[in-house]
């Protein structure tokens, strides 16, 4: 499972001209399930994401997590993160989980995030979304938990 996280001062997602999710300062997270992923990978990735230290402490070092700063988390499904771009000029999405599994894992991830973190907003699986954000830094990290085979 993959999470591309960006530290933001604000972020929102719009579907059909309606804002369906928005946060202030926190993390905007593009989330992708890969073939072979299970709730085990989702749990591991969520734990890492909520504890990942990307916010500055009093000394200016990245030493605080989104949990520590009580920041928002905007979770946006994006299967294109699993693209295989190694050959040719057209990406292959073979590494991505099948849509049914991906939706199930996204929903599971969101449910677990809501249980573990106060401020959670989401995009809509399968929708054409417009995502807006103001990067803070910019600070961007790729987190990935590979399925145990």
UniProtKB/Swiss-Prot annotation:
Location of this chain's protein in the cell: Cytoplasm
Any one GO cellular component localisation term in the record: cytoplasm
Catalytic activity: glycyl-tRNA(Ala) + H2O = tRNA(Ala) + glycine + H(+); a D-aminoacyl-tRNA + H2O = a tRNA + a D-alpha-amino acid + H(+)
Keywords: Cytoplasm, Hydrolase, RNA-binding, tRNA-binding
Motif (Gly-cisPro motif, important for rejection of L-amino acids): 137-138
Secretion signal span: none
Biological process per Gene Ontology, one example term: D-amino acid catabolic process
Domain notes: A Gly-cisPro motif from one monomer fits into the active site of the other monomer to allow specific chiral rejection of L-amino acids.
Biological role stated in the UniProt entry: An aminoacyl-tRNA editing enzyme that deacylates mischarged D-aminoacyl-tRNAs. Also deacylates mischarged glycyl-tRNA(Ala), protecting cells against glycine mischarging by AlaRS. Acts via tRNA-based rather than protein-based catalysis; rejects L-amino acids rather than detecting D-amino acids in the active site. By recycling D-aminoacyl-tRNA to D-amino acids and free tRNA molecules, this enzyme counteracts the toxicity associated with the formation of D-aminoacyl-tRNA entities in vivo and helps enforce protein L-homochirality.
HAMAP family for this protein: Deacylase_Dtd (MF_00518)
Protein name, entry field: D-aminoacyl-tRNA deacylase
Species name: Herminiimonas arsenicoxydans
